[in-house]
Every structure is written in structure tokens, then in C-alpha cells.
Amino acid sequence: MNRILMLCLAFLAIGQTHAQTKTAAMDVAYRRSSLYKMMIDDPSRQYADVIKNSFVQGPNQDKFNEHNLVIRTIPATDAKDESANIIAFIEANNIARDIVAKWFDRSPKGGFDMKLIQTRGSYDASDLDISKAKMSKRGTAMLADAGEDLIKNTFILVNDFKYVSKEEVAEKTKMALGGLSKIGGSLGVSSSLTGASSEALTVAGKGYVVKTTAHLFRLVWNEETAAIFYNDYWADDATITPERKKAFEDSKIFKLEYVGSDVSWADVQSSSFTQKTNEQLIERATNKAVDAVIVKLQKEHDEFKTKTPLFSGEPITAKIGMKEGLTDKSKFDVMEQQQDADGKIQYVSVGSVKVDDSFPIWDNRYGAQDENPDSKIDRTYFKKVSGKDFYRGMLIVQKKGK
């Protein structure tokens, strides 16, 4: 009897170990792009302090690694287009260099380490020992992989916000169009805000339409830049010299490249019975505007798209929703992480899915919980279009323009 009991316990232990291994595999870590958010600061605008505080203290984009520097605002100029001002500010303040410094945890002494890259890339610490890595094929591959998959995918998003109350929009529309029966875009607003309805004007006094013009940049990190950094600037705190410290501080090799710009509107709904103050409405509008313009930029620029892990494989679900711009027509490629002989991560397409319109799309937009406190929806459901079995931890990437 004791022997039988021991055998049963042994099989049970094996089963538990297998289940734990499978769960660990399903919860595989994945690499995110990194995002540094800035804004144009114009103190002359109404609620300037509220606008700035709402942006600076707002939530991070959960599909990106946060890579903000201390500098979050760029002083506005009198120009209608702030593009030239943004570029001049970035260059004068060595933003690209300081982004690299943050990647390598530069200390006050001037030394670097690989801790942040190790964490974000899920690397083994020994693989990223610089002194050893440069002397082995695998180590060199790991450094190249870190640059290609992590450092290179660092983006800078500069927002220029303009705030207009719904009441002001409605009044200007009424004057411009000669009545509420006409719906138009001559003021640059959506038709939902200019409808021929006296009820719309009744609630227009509370709530803001937010226009953000966003400019997207990307850190330039290529083989040449990496070689100069590792050969001429790299040193940890134990080996740093005044010459290397100064060489990095004086360096002009680090650059940002322009990706694109886009404009988006964010509408903060309100009602006659709202208890929210103007400051709270502006705070919500700021964050919703950022989410909205990121969605537009991602649809036009594949390199800016984020990966999202499947939350479950059967049914197929993911923690993604309206904040990411999902509609019932949204389609995604399903990607699987694979590691080659040198340890480099590759993403291979293994199928595709589309939003399952028999379920509601998760409303995860900023403030949605306040508007729908009883909602139990916390994920979006998908249908398989092609591919075999999918499992938790596989990554989905939205198809271009979808």
C-alpha cells in the first residue's frame, strides 16, 4: 500500500510540474517599444496649469515602456506651426543623448550598466556583460538584438493641445452656418458636435473638445552608433575615466528621426447633471486626446504599432479595446516569439484574428469606468481567421490601416 501511495504521489508531482511549466510558458514576457511623452506649454492659454499638470501627471501608455526624461514640456512660440521650435529644442537640450543615457542607467559618475536593458529584454545578466559580450558571437548577437528590438524602438511624442468648449463650438457653428439644421466641418469639428439639436446646446457648457497636433520621432540607433557608443563611451563606474565621461557628454552622434504627425479630436461627454468641475473635464480630455492621436499614428506607421499578448487562447481574448481604436472591423496578425541559435528573438506570424462582433468591445478609454461603473467587461473577444491553435502569451499586432 505504501509503495502504491508513493507512486501516486510521484505521478501527481510530475503532473503539477508539467502544469507549472506550461503556465510559465503561457505567461512569456514580451518586448515593448518605449515612449517618451512631451508637450508644448503655452502659459497664455486658459487653464494652462491644469493642462500641464493633467499631461505630466497623467497615466503612462500601458502598451509601452515609459521612457520619460525630466524635461516634459517645450515652451511655446508665436508660430502657428511649432515643428521648427520642437526640433530646435530637442537638439539644444541633447534629448537624443539623454534618452540613450537613460537606457544605460548612466550614473552621476558617468558610468553605465545594462540593468534596464536586461529587465526590459528579459536577458540573462551574463549575456550582457559588455567586457565579455564583445568577445563572443553570442554576446555580440545579444548586443545587436538589444539595439534592434529595444533601443531602436524608442519613440518621442510631442503633443500641442488646443482646447475649445462645446458651447463655443456650437455658437461658432450656428453663426457660420446660419442655423442648426446644417452639419459641417468648416470649424474642424466632428458632426456629432454640430448637430441640429437644442438639447446639444443645453449640455454644451460643460465638456471640452480637445484638439491635439502630435509629432512623432524615433531614436536613431544603428550599427555605427552602437559601435561608437560601446567602443568610445562605454565604461561602468569602476572603469570610467574623465576622458570617456566628457566624450559622451560632448557627443553629437545621437539623433532623432521624424516619423510623422497627426491631428486628433477628443470629446469629453458631459450632461446637465454632471458633478465634475472644469478642471476634471480638462484632465480627462487631455488623456483621451493622447490616446486618440496614438491610435491614428499607429494606423499609419507600422513601426509605432504595439504588440499585445493574448489573454486567453480559447476563447481568444486580449486586454485591448476602444482606447486602442478597435472596431468590429479590426484585424490582427498573431505572432509567436522564437529564439534562434544565437539567442536572438524573432517574431513569426502564425495566423490572424478579427474582432468577434457577437461580443461588445471593451471600453478601456480614460474615464470609462466613471461613465459605466457597472460594466463587467474587461477584455475584447476575437475570431480566428487563419492559423492553428493559439495560446495565452502569443502576441497580436494590428494590420495596417485596420
Q: What name fits each language-model region?
A:
Residues 20-402:
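Surface-exposed, polar/charged interaction patches used for macromolecular assembly or partner binding
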Residues 14-19:
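Sec/Tat signal peptide C-region and signal peptidase I cleavage site
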Residues 4-13:
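Sec-dependent N-terminal signal peptides
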